Amino acid sequence: MKNENETEQACLLRLTKKAIERTGRAAETKTARRSITVELPEEINEIAGNLPALTLDIVPVLIPYDKEKDPMWIADRELRQWCYTYPNSQLNDSVDRNQQSEKIDGYFSYKSLVKMIKSWKKVHFGKNKTPKGFILECMVAQFHNPQAKYWVDAVIDFLQNVCNVYPDPNGLQYIPEVHDISNLNPQTIPIAKTIESARHVLNKMHWSLTQVKLAKETAETNLYQAAKILQLVFGSDGSMDLCFPLPEEDDTKRNNVASIAEMGSKHDVREAPKFG
């Protein structure tokens, strides 16, 4: 039931929030512009098994014609209107894009790179809203090199392509926009709400590019030091549960390239699961 003076869009989000809160699991919910953000704490359940902490953005979608066809509608609380969304083509185009990228260490590189850049965001921006994870995925889709043969080159090529298009973040006079991951969506999406936020994101990408290039050069003579540099970009042990793994510290093994591959962990940002 819509409240007095409440828009249809605000009503849909409010009812979605109430439905989530009735699920029975303790959750902290917050209404965003187009979604409901849900923070689920870890839950100890000796019968059904423990449930891990989880953060979700739940977007209610209205299906005007057919659930298999785009576009659909989502509520925009700030604009007070319905906006098109393309969930089917977003998924299908992402799968195609991923499978058309080179495999590196057994993984298609596109989706793995998305996970790495989202980990990068967590290290440098924490829980800040900017840059949004979806925006970073759009940026990877637009600027990645699907032919990259090695992870370090996949990261360098992505960052280099971004920096080539935006060589002077401090001189920006407008907020850059990127294409949606859906090839059907004709609209572009701003990478931030303000020019200052956009400059901050792009400056961090410029800095990261410099560091990753330095790490690649350093790896030719000192693999351990190269990994330490990459930890500045992708996190170190104990840093927000993310890490770039170090090779063995033994001087006789510091230049052993294979040692990095052997030191895998569930928090290794390079170990994205298979996709598609």
What do these predicted ranges mean?
Residues K2-E6, P146-Q147:
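A generic structural motif
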Residues E4, Q9-K69:
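Conserved catalytic core of two-metal-ion nucleotidyltransferases
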Residues L13-E21, V114, K118, A141, ...:
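Generic solvent-exposed, charged/amphipathic alpha-helical segments
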Residues T16-A27, K121-H124, V162, Y166:
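Hydrophobic, Leu/Ile/Phe/Ala-enriched alpha-helical segments that form helix-helix packing faces
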Residues I47-K115, G264, A272-G276:
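Extended, alpha-helix-rich binding/interface surfaces that flank or overlap catalytic cores
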Residues N92-Q147:
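A long, hydrophobic alpha-helical segment
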Residues H124-P176:
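Hydrophobic, mid-to-C-terminal alpha-helical segments
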Residues G171-G276:
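Terminal (often C-terminal) interaction modules
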